C-alpha cells in the first residue's frame, strides 16, 4: 500500500506532429534496420513531407539521439527531403555529416555546438562537394565550433558557398583572414562575428553595398581605435541592424561616439549597445528620433533605458533593466549570451518577488536561459530563484504542465551539476516542494527522488530537511513498483530516514518533518521486500515500537507507522521478525482504536501474520486464536470512512488473504479493504481489480461453501460495484495473468 494516490495529467497536450516526431525520435529501432556500416535506414519506403523531415532532424538533435548511426536515415533524399537542417549539439563525424546531409539541397544549416571532431572546415568541405548546395544554401550557423584541426589548417574555406546570405560564426576561433574570405561572398547580407578573434574590421568594406545585419558582440581582440571603427561602420551604406554590445569589461566610448555622430547609418532600424559605458537616455533618444524607422535599442547593463520614451512598451522594443518589458525582451534576445542572461535574471528576481498572477510567458524565458547555460552557476542560481518566485503556491496552477515539466527537469539538471552549492540546492528544493509540480507535472521522479535523498544525507538544515522529506514522501508514491524497490534498495536512504525518525522520537517532537519522513518510509517499503529487509536490519521495528510508545495519542503518527508495518507484514520471509509479544501487544491495543484509520492498519498487520497458519505461528496458539476473534469483531464495528484513507498500487497482496477460509477474519479484512477503495474511487480501483483478475477471485469466494456470511456479504457488495462499473464504462479488458502468492494454511 502507498500513502498517496496518483493523479492524471490531462492538460497542456502537445500537438499531434510533436507527438509523432517524439515517438519516431525515441523509437527509431522500431522503424529502422541497420546497414553494414552501422547506420540506420527506414525499413518501409515512407516519404516524409519536407517540413516533417526538417522537424524530425531537429527533434533528434534536441533529444540528443542524433549520431553517426541515426543520422543515416537522412541519406535517402527521396524519403527525407531536407531544406532547413538543425543539428545543434549533435555528435556526428565528418563522414556521417557528408553522407547524410550534404546530398540535400539545403537552404539553411544550423550546426551550432556540434562535437569538436566536426570542424568548420569539415562542414564547408562537405557542403561544397555538392554544386547545387553551394548555390542553394542561404543561411549557415556555425556558432561555437572549431575552425579546423591542427593537422589541417584551412584558409579561404568559405568562398565556395556562393549562395550564402547569412553567416554566423560567434564563439569561434575566427581570425582576420577568415573575415577577409567571408567578405568576398557575393550575396552576403548578414554576418555575426561575436566573440571571435577578429582584430580589424576593414574587410567589411567589401560588403558596404549589401551588408544589412552586423553583429559583433564582445569583440575582445579588436585593435582599432574608436575613430577607425566608426570610419568603417559609417561606410556600410545599407546597414539596418548593428550590434556592438559588450559584457561591461571594457571602457571604450564607441557607443557614446556612435550615438553622437550626426547622420551616421541613416537606414539603421536596430542598434544594440548593451553593456557599453557612457550611454545616456538623452543621447539614445536623439539618435532614435533622427531615425524614425527604428524598432529596437539594446540597453541592458547600461545607464540608459529609464525614461518613458525608452520604456519598451510601444513600437520601439528595448532591452534593459528598468521594467518587466525590457527584462523579458533581454531574456528573449540574449538567451545564448551568458553574461546578459545572468544580468537579466538578476533584475527579474527582484521584479517577481511579489508577483500575484501566473506568468508562463516569463517562466518560459527563464527555462530557456537555464537550458542554454547548464554549467554556468550564476545563471542557474538566479534562474532557480526566479523559478521559485514564478511557481510558488497557487501560481503553479496557472502554468501549463508541459512548461512546468520542462522547468522541473532543468532544476534537476542544476541540482545534479552543482551538488555542493547549498543555495542552489535550496532554491531547487523550494520550487520542487509544490503540490502542483509533485502531483501533476511530468518529469523524471525517480531521478528527482535520488537527488533529493542525496541532499538530505549531506545536510542538517532543519527547514530544508522538512521540505526534502516532504518531496520524497510524495515522489515515492508516484514511482513504479520497480523504481520504488530500486530507490529503497539503496541502504543509505533507509538509514537516513530512520535517523530522522530517531532524532524526532528522542526529542519527543511531532512535526511535519517526522510525518513526512514516516510517509516516505511507508511509500518506499510498498511492495519492496528489499527495502523492508533494510528496515528490519537497521532496527526499524524496535524504533517504530518506540515511536508508538512515545506518541500514544497521535493518531496520524500511528496511522503512518502501522501503514509501513503493513508493508513489512506482506513479506512472508519477515514474519518471524514480527513475532514479538511486546509488538503484538501494541498492535492489539491499536486494533481497538476509535480511529478507523488506525484500527484498519493494525488489523492488516494481524491479518497478514495470522494468514500463514498455525505451523508458522511461533507464539502461543491461544494468542493467535484470540487475535483472530478480535480482528473479526473489530472489522464489523468499523464505520464507513468519509474519504479514501489509503491508496494501493495493486490488489495482488490481497488475493492470498481471500483464500484463507479457515480464518474468516483475515478474509474479512482483505474484502473490507477492497470494498473501501473500490467504493471511494471506482474509476481507478474497479478497473484495477478487473484487470488483475479480481472478479474470478471474488466469484470463487461467494460460491465457496466455507465462506463466512460476513465475508460473503462484503464480496457480493464488491461484485455489485464491479458490475455497475462495467455497465457504466463498458470495461472489457482481459485480466492480466498473475502469479499466485503462497496460499493460506489453517
UniProtKB/Swiss-Prot annotation:
Keyword Disulfide bond attributed: no
Superkingdom of the organism of origin: Eukaryota
GO biological process: cranial skeletal system development; notochord development
One Pfam family from the record: ZER1-like_2nd
InterPro entries the UniProt entry points to: ARM-like, ARM-type_fold, Armadillo, LRR_dom_sf, ZER1-like_C, Zyg-11_UBL_adapter
Keywords: Leucine-rich repeat, Repeat, Ubl conjugation pathway
Family to which this protein belongs: Belongs to the zyg-11 family.
Functional description taken from the UniProt entry: Serves as substrate adapter subunit in an E3 ubiquitin ligase complex zyg11-cul2-elongin BC. Targets substrates bearing N-terminal glycine degrons for proteasomal degradation.
Protein name: Protein zyg-11 homolog
Source species of the chain: Danio rerio
Gene (UniProt): zyg11
Amino acid at each position: 500500500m502507498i500513502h498517496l494516490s496518483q493523479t492524471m495529467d490531462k492538460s497542456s497536450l502537445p500537438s499531434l506532429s510533436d507527438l509523432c516526431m517524439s515517438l519516431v525520435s525515441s523509437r527509431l529501432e522500431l522503424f529502422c534496420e541497420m546497414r553494414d556500416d552501422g547506420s540506420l535506414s527506414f525499413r518501409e519506403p515512407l516519404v516524409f513531407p519536407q517540413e516533417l523531415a526538417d522537424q524530425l532532424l531537429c527533434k533528434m538533435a534536441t533529444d540528443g539521439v542524433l549520431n553517426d548511426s541515426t543520422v543515416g536515415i537522412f541519406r535517402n533524399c527521396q524519403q527525407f527531403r531536407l531544406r532547413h537542417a538543425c543539428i545543434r549539439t549533435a555528435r556526428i563525424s565528418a563522414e556521417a555529416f557528408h553522407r547524410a546531409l550534404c546530398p540535400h539541397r539545403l537552404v539553411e544549416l544550423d550546426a551550432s555546438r556540434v562535437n569538436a571532431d566536426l570542424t568548420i572546415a569539415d562542414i564547408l568541405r562537405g557542403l561544397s562537394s555538392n554544386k547545387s548546395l553551394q548555390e542553394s544554401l542561404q543561411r549557415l550557423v556555425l556558432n561555437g565550433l572549431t575552425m579546423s584541426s591542427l593537422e589541417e589548417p584551412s584558409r579561404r574555406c568559405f568562398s565556395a558557398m556562393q549562395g550564402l546570405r547569412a553567416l554566423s560564426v560567434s564563439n569561434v576561433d575566427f581570425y582576420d583572414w577568415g573575415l577577409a574570405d567571408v567578405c568576398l561572398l557575393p550575396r552576403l547580407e548578414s554576418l555575426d562575428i561575436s566573440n571571435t578573434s577578429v582584430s580589424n574590421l576593414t574587410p567589411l568594406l567589401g560588403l558596404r553595398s549589401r551588408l544589412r545585419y552586423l553583429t559583433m558582440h564582445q569583440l575582445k581582440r579588436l585593435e582599432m581605435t574608436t575613430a577607425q571603427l566608426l570610419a568603417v561602420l559609417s561606410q556600410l551604406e545599407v546597414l539596418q541592424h548593428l550590434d556592438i554590445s559588450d559584457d561591461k569589461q571594457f571602457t571604450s566610448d564607441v557607443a557614446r561616439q556612435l550615438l553622437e555622430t550626426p547622420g551616421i547609418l541613416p537606414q539603421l532600424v536596430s542598434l544594440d549597445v548593451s553593456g557599453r559605458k557612457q550611454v545616456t537616455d538623452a543621447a539614445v533618444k536623439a539618435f532614435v528620433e533622427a531615425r524614425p524607422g527604428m524598432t529596437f535599442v539594446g540597453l541592458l547593463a547600461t545607464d540608459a533605458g529609464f525614461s518613458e520614451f525608452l520604456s519598451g512598451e510601444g513600437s520601439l522594443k528595448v532591452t534593459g533593466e528598468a521594467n518587466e518589458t525590457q527584462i523579458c525582451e533581454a531574456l528573449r534576445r540574449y538567451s545564448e549570451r551568458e553574461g546578459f542572461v545572468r544580468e537579466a535574471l538578476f533584475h527579474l528576481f527582484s521584479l517577481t518577488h511579489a508577483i500575484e498572477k501566473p506568468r508562463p510567458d516569463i517562466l518560459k524565458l527563464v527555462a530557456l536561459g537555464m537550458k542554454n547555460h547548464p554549467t554556468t552557476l550564476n545563471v542557474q542560481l538566479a534562474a532557480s530563484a526566479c523559478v521559485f518566485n514564478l511557481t510558488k503556491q497557487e501560481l503553479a496552477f496557472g502554468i501549463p504542465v508541459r512548461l512546468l515539466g520542462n522547468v522541473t527537469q532543468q532544476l534537476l539538471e542544476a541540482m545534479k551539476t552543482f551538488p555542493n552549492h547549498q543555495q542552489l540546492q535550496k532554491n531547487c528544493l523550494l520550487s520542487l516542494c509544490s503540490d502542483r509540480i509533485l502531483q501533476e507535472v511530468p518529469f523524471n521522479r525517480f531521478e528527482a527522488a535520488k537527488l533529493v535523498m542525496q541532499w538530505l544525507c549531506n545536510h542538517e538544515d532543519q527547514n530544508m530537511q522538512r521540505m526534502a522529506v516532504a518531496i520524497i514522501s510524495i515522489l515515492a508514491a508516484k514511482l513504479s513498483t520497480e523504481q520504488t524497490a530500486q530507490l529503497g534498495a539503496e541502504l543509505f536512504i533507509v538509514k537516513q530516514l530512520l535517523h530522522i525518525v530517531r532524532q524526532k522520537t528522542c526529542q519527543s517532537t511531532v512535526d511535519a518533518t517526522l510525518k513526512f519522513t514516516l510517509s516516505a518510509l511507508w511509500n518506499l517499503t510498498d511492495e519492496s521486500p528489499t527495502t523492508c529487509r533494510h528496515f528490519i536490519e537497521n532496527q526499524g521495528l524496535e524504533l517504530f515500537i518506540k515511536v508508538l510508545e512515545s506518541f500514544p495519542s497521535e493518531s496520524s503518527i500511528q496511522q503512518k507507522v502501522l501503514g509501513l508495518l503493513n508493508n513489512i507484514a506482506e513479506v512472508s520471509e519477515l514474519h518471524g521478525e514480527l513475532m514479538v509479544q511486546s509488538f503484538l501487544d501494541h498492535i492489539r491495543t491499536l486494533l481497538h482504536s476509535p480511529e478507523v484509520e488506525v484500527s484498519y492498519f493494525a488489523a492488516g498487520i494481524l491479518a497478514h501474520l495470522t494468514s500463514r497458519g498455525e505451523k508458522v505461528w511461533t507464539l502461543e496458539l491461544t494468542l493467535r486464536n484470540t487475535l483472530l476473534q478480535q480482528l473479526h469483531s473489530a472489522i464489523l464495528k468499523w464505520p464507513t470512512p468519509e474519504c479514501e484513507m489509503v491508496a494501493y498500487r495493486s490488489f495482488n497482496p490481497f488475493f492470498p488473504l481471500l483464500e484463507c477460509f479457515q480464518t474468516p477474519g483475515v478474509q474479512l479484512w482483505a474484502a473490507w479493504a477492497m470494498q473501501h477503495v473500490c467504493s471511494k474511487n471506482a474509476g481507478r480501483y474497479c478497473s484495477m481489480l478487473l484487470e488483475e483478475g479480481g472478479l474470478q477471485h471474488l466469484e470463487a469466494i461467494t460460491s465457496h461453501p466455507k465462506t463466512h456470511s460476513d465475508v460473503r456479504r462484503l464480496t457480493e457488495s464488491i461484485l455489485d460495484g464491479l458490475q455497475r462499473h462495467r455497465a457504466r464504462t463498458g470495461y472489457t479488458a482481459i485480466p492480466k495473468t498473475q502469479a499466485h502468492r503462497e496460499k493460506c494454511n489453517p
